[in-house]
Structures are given as C-alpha cells and as structure tokens.
Amino acid sequence: GGIKIHHLDASSPEAASLIGMRRPDVVFHLAAFPRRAASIQDHGASFTRSLAVIEAARHHGVGRVVVALPATSLYGHPAANSLPVKESDPVPRGVRGVVARAVLDVLSEYREAEGLEFAALSLASVYGPRQAPAGGVVAAFNDALVSGEQPELHGDGRQTRDFVYVDDVVDALVRAADRSSGLLINIGTGQQTAVRDLWKQMSGGVLNDPTELPARRNELQRFAVSSVRARIHLGWSSWTDLADGLARVRSAG
C-alpha cells in the first residue's frame, strides 16, 4: 500500500487521535524544532508540540518515541579541545537549547514514571537534495548557485559545522526504533568543516566569495559531535563523505 500523509499540528487533538487510531509501535517526532524560530513563542510551541506528542504516545500505549533534537543548540559553545562534543556535555545555548534540554528531561521522566521508552537523537547539520533554502547553509548555497545569485554569509566563514547527509540520518532514525533505551545519542560525522570551505567545494572555487554580513549574535564558532555512542548503541556511523553528499545536492538542482 501507499503512504498517506496527514497535514496536522503535532500538538493538536487530531494528531493525538491519529496516534490512537494507528496504534504504532514507535512514534518518530521530527517536527519539534523548526530551522528558524522567530520568537520566544516559537520556542514555547516547540516544547508544547513535543509534550503533546509524548503524552499522546503514552496515552495510547505506544512503546517508544524517537525524537530529533538540534545538536548545535544543545551543546552551547564547546571549547576547541572538547570537540567533537560528547553526549555528557550538554550546556544549552539560547532559548532553543534550553527547550531542547527540557524535552530531553521530559522524556527521561516519562520513561521512569510511565515506562515510555525513548531515543533522543541529537542531530548535527543535516543536508541533502531538494532541501528548502532556509533549511541550512548547504541548501542556501545551492540555491544561490542554481539561481546565479551571490550568496550571503554571516561572519567571515571561519565558523565550522558538522555536516551529515540526510540518508545517513534516516538510517540512524530507523535503527533507533528498536535499539538503545533512554539515551541521548549524537548523529554526525565528528568532522568540522568551515563554512567558507564549504562554499569553495560547492562552487568549484571559481566563483566570488559570498557577501559578508555581520556575524549573528551568539554565533557558534566551532562545532562537531562525537558519534561513538551511536556506533556502540545503534551500530551506526556516517558513511557519506562531504564531497559525495554535496555532489548529490548539486546534481539534484
């Protein structure tokens, strides 16, 4: 059979009713944290959505919830000698990070008090073909290359990120459906890539550098996550190197 898609607010009674009707073994909650939250209210909605999904899963006897959390917000500003950052070092950055940590705490409480198992996957910078331009710097750069427009970059481009390909992330999510229990698990490559080097790879080094804009307040300067726990508990590690992943993004247009 085919896949039926329901367009619902994850915090709505209709979404809870759908969980009750389908009675799944596992609920994947990937809608908690939109790429860009414009206000404190948006962050509050992230928590409300997550709590609603967790409670609906408990109420309808779901065995496990797999939740995606934003790694760059969860671990604050790690020192260079602490990279790639481990799961034992969460120091939330900004309201988004505080909310992500709160969701993790709620999951732990539901597991202890209600027996609802969970896996919380802390995702690095996920990218892939046909990603919306607002979805991340890879998508924004690709959109600029396709449209012929000059991309914009906040800061000097020396800031680093851990870019992990979407297919690899999907594999980790599927593995988390029946492995591990009550754990926060990083999903990333463990490798840092400077944003300006990313542009050089994508543009072939023959186009002008992006237009430099003022750095964002509280900008994260360097980041990568350790995937040791993922290898141990999920049997997972990233297999798509950045060059191959970017080639797939570019070929998809």
Regions found by a protein language model. Give the residues of each.
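NAD(P)H-binding glycine-rich loop region in Rossmannoid oxidoreductase-like domains
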Residues: 8-46
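Conserved Rossmann-fold NAD(P)-dependent oxidoreductase catalytic core, especially the SDR/UDP-sugar
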Residues: 29, 51-95
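A conserved pocket-lining segment of Rossmann-fold NAD(P)-dependent short-chain dehydrogenase/reductase
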Residues: 39, 87-93, 118-126, 141-164, ...
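Short-chain dehydrogenase/reductase
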Residues: 43-44, 92-104, 131, 135-139, ...
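Conserved active-site helix of classical SDR/Rossmann-fold NAD(P)-dependent CH-OH oxidoreductases
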Residues: 50-51, 100-108, 139-142, 171
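Flexible, glycine-rich beta-alpha linker
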Residues: 74-75, 94-95, 119-136
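Active-site Tyr-X1-5-Lys
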Residues: 78-79, 93-122, 145-147
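C-terminal substrate-binding subdomain of Rossmann-fold SDR/epimerase-dehydratase oxidoreductases
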Residues: 145-253
